[in-house]
From Swiss-Prot:
Residues that coordinate or bind sn-glycerol 3-phosphate: 106, 137, 139, 193, 246, 256-258
Family matches, as Gene3D superfamilies: N-(1-d-carboxylethyl)-l-norvaline Dehydrogenase, domain 2, NAD(P)-binding Rossmann-like Domain
Keywords: Cytoplasm, Lipid biosynthesis, Lipid metabolism, NAD, NADP, Nucleotide-binding, Oxidoreductase, Phospholipid biosynthesis, Phospholipid metabolism
Protein name per UniProt: Glycerol-3-phosphate dehydrogenase [NAD(P)+]
Entry keyword annotation includes ATP-binding: no
Protein source organism: Bacillus licheniformis (strain ATCC 14580 / DSM 13 / JCM 2505 / CCUG 7422 / NBRC 12200 / NCIMB 9375 / NCTC 10341 / NRRL NRS-1264 / Gibson 46)
Single GO biological process annotation from the record: glycerophospholipid metabolic process
GO cellular component: cytosol
Main location: cytoplasm
Catalytic activity, EC: 1.1.1.94
Function: Catalyzes the reduction of the glycolytic intermediate dihydroxyacetone phosphate (DHAP) to sn-glycerol 3-phosphate (G3P), the key precursor for phospholipid synthesis.
Length: 346
């Protein structure tokens, strides 16, 4: 069997290991916690992050990074955004041939405002990169682990052939994979939906009901599309799986860490209390800071993102943030389209 390595022993990395094992790949999961790795190998289950999901015999785990990445042509990067640079910096010294690197995280680096593929280019020497591919879409690990029907998108930095190779690698009767040439749009949609999911959780925590959440999801998508398009993404991408698809599932499901975190904020918990209680990475918090900075850099109106930024980092009450959003100056719903049309008519 062909060997594939997954860097990251969390819920998503483990779920993807199950998909690849079902497709008859020899899967090696790398993680840094000795007790977790031992548990996966002994019980064929990740009880910490994906309990109840049994892994097949062709999935093994290791803390030895060299053993994980040496002689491997496909490396899945499934660690949180903040850990990607550190893990790749360690891994590159052990990689001995060109490989396709597939990242499955969703975020933006706050300090540099780089997308994940851009971060990876800085850490992986060109002579070791066959290509960089992103896999994204509405895909809770818990449901993938149960082999429920799931559909995602892959996009490659350099060639459609790389995207198609990863499509072939993952696709089976339970896990459908599309390709999309718009890597910028795919990455931005996947990252920014976490910001809107935090806000959606807040509205639920406040008990505001379906009307408020429907409006927030819709206007949140408008913010994502505005920024993503300004950064070079294709507007159509945001109407697809990595745009509205991922946004819906993350804003409405109890499986969503970002929704759960927002829900606690809406119920009055402080951010520090929320993060401690969650015990898992909540990407939307860091991404909110990055998205706010990007909105200023590209001069894009993102009122929901700005309001959430005030709640998370300036201590504003969630009720005050909602009041500010509702009191904004009246405007046309399709403001961007109207402005574009008017400019074309001049």
């Amino acid at each position: 069997m062909t060997k594939v390595s997954i860097l990251g022993a969390g819920s998503w990395g483990t779920a993807l290991a199950l998909v690849l094992a079902d497709n008859q790949y020899d899967v090696c999961i790398w993680g840094h916690r000795e007790e977790l790795i031992q548990q996966i190998n002994e019980h064929h289950e990740n009880k910490d992050y994906l309990p109840g999901v049994k892994l097949s015999e062709n999935v093994r785990a290791t803390t030895d990074l060299e053993a994980a990445v040496a002689d491997v042509k496909t490396i899945i990067v499934a660690v949180p955004t903040k850990a990607i640079r550190e893990v790749l910096a360690q891994a590159v010294s052990f990689i001995n041939q060109k490989a396709i690197f597939v990242h499955v995280s969703k975020g933006i680096e706050p300090d540099t405002l780089l997308r994940i593929s851009e971060m990876m280019k800085e850490e992986i020497p060109a002579e070791l990169r066959e290509d960089i591919v992103v896999l994204s879409g509405p895909s809770h690990a818990e449901e993938v682990g149960l082999r429920h029907p799931t559909t995602v998108t892959v996009s490659a930095d350099s060639s459609i052939e790389s995207a198609q190779a990863i499509q072939d690698m993952f696709m089976n009767q339970n896990f459908r994979v599309y390709t999309n040439p718009d890597m910028i749009g795919v990455e931005i949609g996947g990252a920014l939906k976490n910001v809107i999911a935090l806000a959606a959780g807040i509205t639920d925590g406040l008990g505001y009901g379906d009307n408020a959440k429907a409006a927030l999801i819709t206007r949140g998508l408008a913010e994502i599309a505005r920024l993503g398009t300004k950064m070079g993404g294709n507007p159509l991408t945001f109407s697809g799986l990595t745009g509205i698809g991922d946004l819906i599932v993350t804003c409405t499901s109890v499986h969503s860490r970002n929704w759960r975190a927002g829900n606690m904020l809406g119920k009055g918990f402080k951010l520090d209390e929320v993060l401690e209680e969650m015990g898992m990475v909540v990407e939307g918090v860091r991404t909110t800071k990055a998205a706010y900075q990007l909105s200023k850099k590209f001069d894009v109106k993102m009122p929901i993102t700005e309001a959430l930024h005030k709640v998370l980092f300036d201590g504003e009450k969630v009720e005050t943030a909602v009041e500010s959003l509702m009191a904004r100056v009246k405007t046309h719903e399709m403001e961007d389209l109207v402005n574009t049309f008017e400019n074309q008519m001049k």
